[in-house]
């Protein structure tokens, strides 16, 4: 792919494509001081969600997360967070080692910030697709929608969340392990750990293991200051939400895989 014309004020050269997909393209570049950084060009499909992600990045200001250097139109200029993913740790050192690192990153992300966090997605908006499938299909979707409503009514102190933390969104570089690609959500801290139960998406053997879900929840709970059972409950709801999103995209195969994850986590909630 021919390198695109990034905003000239950034004075970036030597663009190298890192990834391209439905969300847009990501490039590594060299700035005027010879340092590497990353630029992301959002696709039209991803652009509507950009304000929440940018708001969250500005709120963290590099604490536990990639630092936003600038943004212009559909372009984002970001710190180079490194090349090693948490998935590589899982593959080489195992799930327990990867989960310990994820817990450390979560702890850093949930540390207080003096900056305001505005314009984040609400949990009500985030779970709209789940409520729609609950009305259309019932079953697990209805159960998850009911549990989601119950969790959101518990009066838990909400805070800004990454919203999409998983093994390929945690990178290691000069500043250690950092989170990238946030969604920017305002909600129960336990929800920020829930997506790790759903990942890696390629490892259905791990995702559908109830005992693994319980181990992860116990390890991640101290990082977000919530009980392991709350993480498991949100994990079930999130897996059903993911299935609903896949159905919106008419991807029934991935929806079925997501529901397998939901059913596995659901078993940990049964008395």
Each language-model region and where it sits:
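Conserved NTP-binding catalytic cores of kinases and kinase-like/nucleotidyltransferase enzymes
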Residues: 1-65, 176, 264-271
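Regulatory N- and C-terminal appendages and interdomain linkers associated
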Residues: 1-13, 139-142, 150, 208-212, ...
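An alpha-helical support segment within catalytic cores of ATP-dependent transferases
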Residues: 2-6, 114-163, 173, 222
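A conserved alpha-helical element in kinase catalytic cores
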Residues: 22-23, 35-77, 84-109, 209
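Active-site acidic catalytic loop and adjacent metal/ATP-binding pocket
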Residues: 25-30, 39, 68, 146-191
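A cross-family kinase active-site recognition segment
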Residues: 82, 88-142, 184-188, 271
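Active-site Asp-x-Gly
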Residues: 173-218, 222-228, 252, 258-261, ...
């Amino acid at each position: 792919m021919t390198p695109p014309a990034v905003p000239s004020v950034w004075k970036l050269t030597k663009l190298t494509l890192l990834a391209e997909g439905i969300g847009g393209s990501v490039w590594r570049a060299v700035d005027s001081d010879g340092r590497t950084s990353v630029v992301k060009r959002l696709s039209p499909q991803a652009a509507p969600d950009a304000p929440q992600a940018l708001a969250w990045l500005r709120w963290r200001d590099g604490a536990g997360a990639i630092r936003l250097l600038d943004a212009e139109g559909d372009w984002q200029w970001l710190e180079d967070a490194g090349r090693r993913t948490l998935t590589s740790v899982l593959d080489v050192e195992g799930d327990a080692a990867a989960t310990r690192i994820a817990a450390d990153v979560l702890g850093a992300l949930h540390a207080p910030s003096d900056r305001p966090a505005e314009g984040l997605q609400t949990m009500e908006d985030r779970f709209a697709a789940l409520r729609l499938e609950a009305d259309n299909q019932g079953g697990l979707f209805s159960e998850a929608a009911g549990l989601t409503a119950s969790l959101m009514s518990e009066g838990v102190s909400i805070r800004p969340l990454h919203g999409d933390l998983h093994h390929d969104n945690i990178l290691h570089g000069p500043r250690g392990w950092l989170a990238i690609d946030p969604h920017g959500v305002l909600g129960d801290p336990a929800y920020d750990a829930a997506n790790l139960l759903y990942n890696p998406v390629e490892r259905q053997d791990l995702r559908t293991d109830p005992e693994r879900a319980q181990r992860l929840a116990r390890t991640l709970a101290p990082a977000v200051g919530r009980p392991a059972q709350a993480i498991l409950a949100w994990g079930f709801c999130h897996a059903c939400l993911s299935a609903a999103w896949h159905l919106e995209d008419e991807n029934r195969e991935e929806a079925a895989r997501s529901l397998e994850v939901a059913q596995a986590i659901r078993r940990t909630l049964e008395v």
